[in-house]
Amino acid sequence: MCTVPTKRFGRRCALKLGALAALASLEACSSGSSASPTGTVGAAPTNGAAASPTTVSAGVATTVAPSAAATSGTGSAIASGRPATTAAASSVTTGTRPATVANVAGGNRPNIILINTDDLDTKSLPVMPKLKALMTDQGMTFPNYFVNVSLCCPSRSALLRGQYAHNNEVLTNGNPNGGYAHVHALGIENSTIATWLQAAGYRTALMGKYLNGYPASVADTFVPPGWTEWYSPVAGNAYSEYNYKLNENGKVVPYGKKPEDYLTDVIASKATDFIKRSASDPAPFFLYLPTYAPHGPATPGPKYENAFPDAKAPRSPAYNEQDVGDKPQWVQNMPPLAAKQQTTIDELYRKRIQSLQSVDDLIENVINTLKGVGKLDNTYIIFTSDNGFHLGEHRETSGKQAPYEEDIRLPLIVRGPGVAAGKSVEPFVGNVDFAPTFAQWAGATVPDFVDGRSFAPLLSGGAADAWRQTFLIAHYTAESRRGNRPAATGVPPRRQATPGGSAAASTPANGVPETDEEAEAAVGRGIPEFHGLRAKDYVYIEYATKERELYDLAKDPYELQNIAKTANPALLTQLSARLGDLQKASGATFRTVEAQPMPPLAS
């Protein structure tokens, strides 16, 4: 049972009573009464699923000449294997002709702010009252938002490039097939949403976590291409929120353990300063705010150390699943959760929701600052996470990377001009969709390697023409290999990462490893490589071990009954073929395949 806090908070805790009331709603989430297992609630720089048709509308190629600000001392702003000024516009399915710089340069192009939390699950949203009041109630929620690979570096790379992991080749958090050293060696930083928007005349800024292992094989002062302003940890213990160093536009600045050094608050302060400085600048901006919270160790901010003293992790029907005989071997190898493990899970849950209070404050500060400088009405604000997180479901202690709903389904809320307030839309949206969506808002050209599609039409109630009917999910291991991709993917031939880069690449912020729970889940418990299809009413998974999972989510939302062994063999053949087609596809071809109708479970 989920215990709601009843004791008076410590003097330093300044939470609203609304947060307490919201936490009570977790009872419903953990009681099994909900239809959804996840309980979704609603200084200047120095480096200068509804049914839909199956056809895909083609985009229109445009030419964007890089602005003077499109390059910096760190490298070319756009380099995707073709001249930047002739990159073809992706056939991103929007139902309308993609906007171009020529179309909108004379108009009032919107500002874009992306708040990307780390390891946030949907179960924790009820403890964020400011998020609800300022985002959920004022914007649009996407209950079917999924991530391709439920892991930090692959997810963030997909976000920046608009590509699935099998196409951008960022598969894990560390070498040989992931982490910053690998990303930098591939050269994919040279063509991202940052370079595209900067070339289109946007001021771009990142404040917070970039990619796991950054800066790894480059200097601590290195600023990746496309960023006008840059504030990201390069050393120390950023995950602890204290005792870290930031690369601030090419200058390394140390932060200590004083209350004012708390990283989430520092990010918020720099964000509001950037917005205030933007008030008199006619150029639109893209502000990327990737927080470290609530990633472990989930250190709470100074004001919230005593919040939610009695809270326990939600106990859904999937929590500490008793009968796992139908699950793949890696799940069967895990014994039921011991009492000590459950206590540890509850302790981590409390710290996570404590740390989220500072993220809630950040949201409020950003929105209030936008309102104060007159920019709110022309700014899209997006709130999401890099991946989901499990806390006891299916016998797993804590972490991500599994194919289950807790890990692959994430929060996504969008507020901005023309967005219907307090609404929810059902079509599938994924982390590969941010880049083409932002590009459409900005009137920027996107390269043809982009796999995602703009969800901008959904925000204004437009039809999801030729929209995806399934979403590709995957998990990779250190042994996973992908050869050189075809030129159409925009990824140059694989190059060996810098010698010695493996340890650095697997150690975020040059000294902070991923949590022990994640290492245990990915290695000790041996989650094999898998690929899967998340359809409207079911999910299908194939493992490298030849095992399969199939869940009827309409009848079994908590994924307790694997029906793969009793399913119609013809259906399994169809699903396997569709999965294979997607694993080989990229760009417009990928969008065509994923928009094809999915076979029903019952034939």
Question: Which role does the model predict for each range below?
Answer:
Residues 37-100:
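Extracellular mucin-like PTS domains
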Residues 30, 95-97, 106-110, 117, ...:
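Long, internal low-complexity/basic segments
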Residues 103-107, 117-123, 150, 234-262, ...:
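Active-site-proximal cap/lid insertion segments
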Residues 29-38:
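Bacterial lipoprotein signal-peptidase II cleavage site
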Residues 112, 118, 197, 209, ...:
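A short aromatic-rich beta-strand->coil structural motif
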Residues 1-28:
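N-terminal secretory signal peptides
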Residues 114-115, 121-205, 216, 235-238, ...:
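Active-site segment of extracytoplasmic enzymes that catalyze sulfate/phosphate-ester chemistry
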